[in-house]
Amino acid sequence: MFTNWRIFAVNRQKTFSVHIHTTCYCKIKANLKRSKTQVPLTRSYSSPPGIVGNEVKSLHSIINPPVAKIRNIGIMAHIDAGKTTTTERILYYSGYTRSLGDVDDGDTVTDFMAQERERGITIQSAAVTLDWKGYRVNLIDTPGHVDFTLEVERCLRVLDGAVAVFDASAGVEAQTLTVWRQADKHKIPRICFLNKMDKTGASFNYAVESIREKLKAKPLILQLPIGEARTFQGVVDVVNREKLIWNSDSDDGKDFERKPLSEASDPTLLKETVEARNSLIEQVADLDDEFADLVLGEFSEDFDLVPAEKLQAAIHRVTLAQAAVPVLCGSALKNKGVQPLLDAVTTYLPSPEEREHGFLQWYKGDLCALAFKVLHDKQRGPLVFLRIYSGTLTPQSAVHNVNRNCTERMSRLLLPFADQHVEIPSLTAGNIALTVGLKQTATGDTIVSSKSSALAAARRAGKGERKPGRISEAESVLLAGVEIPEPVFFCTIEPPSAAKQPDLDHALEHLQREDPSLKVKLDPDSGQTVLCGMGELHIEIIHDRIKREYGLETYLGPLQVAYRETILNSVRATDTLDRVLGDKRHFARAELEVRPAEEPCGVATIEYADSVGEDMLQAPREDIENAIHSACLQGPLLGSPIQDVAVTLHSLMIHPGTSTTMVTACISRCVQKALKKADKQVLEPLMSLEVTVSREYLSPVLADLAQRRGNIQEIQTRQDNKVVLGFVPLAEIMGYSTVLRTLTSGSATFALELSTYQAMSPQDQRTLLSQRSGLARVL
């Protein structure tokens, strides 16, 4: 059966972050690579993988291992903490590559996009399937840039566990906090890997303390480093009281020695380990009642007698309950500590059956899967990543998309191995699959075996009754999709000629399916296409992909900030629409009120006055509310979306025979009339900012931020550096990378994340409106 497997290659894409290293590592790496012999990025698959590029070993495990032996995990961290390097080492030690990929050399397996290999960053999360000591591990390497936060959100939605990678010299950094919060939201158990223990300034104790203080987590120290920075040579296994020393003569780190600690040879290290183990036992006993009963009953006199397997089982339960996080350490770049990390993944992180999914009881074993990522391949069309929660997927079978109420036929079923894919005959619950043939499916869609299966699940859930505005009964069994953040930047994009506009539209359509955080709009005034994205890097990567993958040399307009608008007072308005079309009269009159919402809200909240009965609402409520929301997409000042607004419909008169289109047009005009009469306010995106800078450059950095309307909240000390925390308007921080590099001689880094939208001062608002010349733009 295995001889019939086939390998395919696809191009892929990702999402981003505004964390910028002012040392311009991407340019340094690009220059270094220019001096080397260039290796083509694309691989030939006329022969089995392993013949060209990174050699890949065929999967030897069974196609569908027991669910208890599956681990769906993600690698998450701040940029440059070593996520991709750690992943490459995992692939190598598990036997799926025969050479070590390196980010600096641009030959990694999971960073397979041209932009990733040139920049030395991860943009798009690459899924990799591998085996380790009888376990199937589905591994996803995620980006650390804030511009690509959606990519992290996508993979966390379908994971059962995660590995958080930290730079041991920096501890918890800005993006670490972001991805940690995302993991908390999805209740994902995780373990921590303190990477770069060989780096100058690495401090195990500092990193552990930052996890405790900044993440408010309870670290369980499972390993101790043997040496730090240049003296780092291995780790101590606290649970088993053993030391692991990597052979200095081994270049690839495969050879290491595991020895029990003894009083004779390691008295000091043994003492530290015993103390750490006793402390670990006490910590776990406080968090796990079963283990506490065992320790107090059988081993109260001597903790040394507590069996390692009992302690490991308790740590597994504590990790699953998210009461604490196991902490390990090593250096992926120096090939030390990665094999024990893989052991910890299989020992402490949960299997799919250990995660609670309440909706599974509705399906009774029928197929239920979530589409969490869509890619586009020029030969095979859309490629959809699915997490299978229940049932079995088979190729050449029809499946039902609950969100889009359509049935599609899946032609092929693949196991993902970065840009290499292995075709398989079936895949069961707990696995991550890649499918070919689902042309309508988008990110966040729920996939079931048939429409009748979805309706049966809805009835079991007790929510099968039709409700006003409900599209279908099956909506009650939709899985929670992936939250799409609002873009903060936009710019126009033009093709090289009008004849190429259809080609550009085609490219943008594909890119939007792959990356839902990319929004494409049409400016009604100029007719230009507008790109809306998560940051400067996001827009830059999209522009680059259009050129590389679709052969279009497009032109970008100036990058602009995506503002919002709101109102400051309550206003009533009335609008009448009276038209004769053919021999039919269409008449509608609406009266409504707009006012500031009591609570912040991204979209308008809609209410109906008591005088508006169901008999007056001859048009469906859904159409009425869509008209109100549509009217709030373009504010009267800048054409920006309106937020923090409440709308109350007071009356609606409709002549018999009036079309729904005329009614909604009347309501939409009435909302716009009310918004124009109200006192208006522009809201600007406010970013949370973290700047890491050496002491000597702190003063000029603070002075520069003050000129940018920055609000400094705190200045922390991190090793020999200062960390400036604060808020700054996004409009003031554009191009900050170049300025900071100049101020600090390229030694500082900074990270940005959208915090909220704040009201602009009257003077700043007047300046902005003057710059925009009063012309509205579609965001």
Swiss-Prot record:
GO MF assignments: GTP binding; GTPase activity
PROSITE patterns membership: G_TR_1 (PS00301), G_TR_2 (PS51722)
First-listed, main subcellular location of the protein, grouped into a coarse class: mitochondrion
Known EC number: 3.6.5.-
A Pfam family reported for this protein in Swiss-Prot or TrEMBL: GTP_EFTU
Biological process terms in GO annotation: mitochondrial translation; ribosome disassembly
Enzyme class, broadest EC rank: hydrolase
Source organism, top-level taxon: Eukaryota
Residues covered by the tr-type G domain: 68-353
Catalytic activity annotation: GTP + H2O = GDP + phosphate + H(+)
A single Gene Ontology CC term: mitochondrion
Residues given in the record as GTP binding sites: 77-84, 141-145, 195-198
Record's miscellaneous remark: This protein may be expected to contain an N-terminal transit peptide but none has been predicted.
UniProt record similarity statement: Belongs to the TRAFAC class translation factor GTPase superfamily. Classic translation factor GTPase family. EF-G/EF-2 subfamily.
Purpose: Mitochondrial GTPase that mediates the disassembly of ribosomes from messenger RNA at the termination of mitochondrial protein biosynthesis. Acts in collaboration with MRRF. GTP hydrolysis follows the ribosome disassembly and probably occurs on the ribosome large subunit. Not involved in the GTP-dependent ribosomal translocation step during translation elongation.
Protein name: Ribosome-releasing factor 2, mitochondrial
